[in-house]
């Protein structure tokens, strides 16, 4: 009887840790499912809002900007008011249309805003947990909270997933310095026709641009 009581007590003590591990795995599996689903898409067109908030005089000062993202397989092009980002699958570029300049930059997932690259960044080095659901714009959004195992800059990341479509809905990063960065999807189209030339850095669109 005492042995049974001790085992029961041990199970009660262990239960919170088992639940935490299960939640961790469920959240990570969901992110992996969304990542795998995103890879199956032939093309993507996303209109988004990017908002950066920073502490200022006891409050938060925010700056928002609109942009568009086009993806064709591994090729990505992001258009914003200030600059464009283009990755042709092997090299990445920053494009400044007003100055007619093109700068070669690092070609890795961290420089891209594509949903697949955002999700790929967080496949390891984080703890994961389900962070509740919300009804937004007629959609059911499941949130997943991530905490880096070792980071002096990032405190927490919150990723919102459209439960029905398994597509990225929003992404928020909270810095240890109080800065908050939010990527919100305004519209998301998949498998629509896209011109392959828009991912060609040597196309006539960039004729005469100065290469830095």
List where the protein language model places each region:
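Flexible, surface-exposed loop/linker segments and immediately adjacent secondary-structure boundaries
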Residues: 107-139
């Amino acid at each position: 009887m005492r042995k049974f009581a001790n085992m029961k007590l041990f199970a009660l003590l262990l239960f919170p840790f088992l639940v935490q591990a299960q939640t961790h795995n469920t959240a990570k599996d969901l992110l992996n499912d969304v990542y795998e689903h995103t890879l199956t898409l032939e093309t993507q067109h996303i209109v988004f809002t990017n908002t950066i908030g920073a502490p200022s005089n006891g409050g938060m000062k925010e700056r928002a900007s609109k942009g568009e993202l086009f993806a064709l397989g591994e090729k990505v092009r992001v258009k914003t008011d200030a600059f464009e980002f283009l990755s042709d699958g092997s090299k990445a570029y920053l494009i400044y249309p007003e100055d007619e300049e093109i700068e070669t930059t690092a070609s890795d997932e961290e420089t891209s805003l594509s949903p697949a690259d955002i999700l790929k960044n967080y496949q390891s080095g984080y703890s994961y947990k389900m962070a509740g659901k919300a009804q937004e714009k007629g959609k059911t959004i499941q949130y997943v909270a991530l905490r880096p195992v070792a980071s002096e800059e990032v405190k927490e990341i919150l990723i919102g997933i459209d439960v029905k479509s398994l597509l990225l809905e929003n992404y928020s990063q909270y810095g240890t310095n109080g800065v908050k960065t939010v990527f919100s999807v305004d519209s998301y189209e998949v498998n629509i026709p896209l011109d392959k030339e828009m991912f060609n850095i040597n196309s006539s669109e960039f004729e005469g641009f100065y290469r830095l």
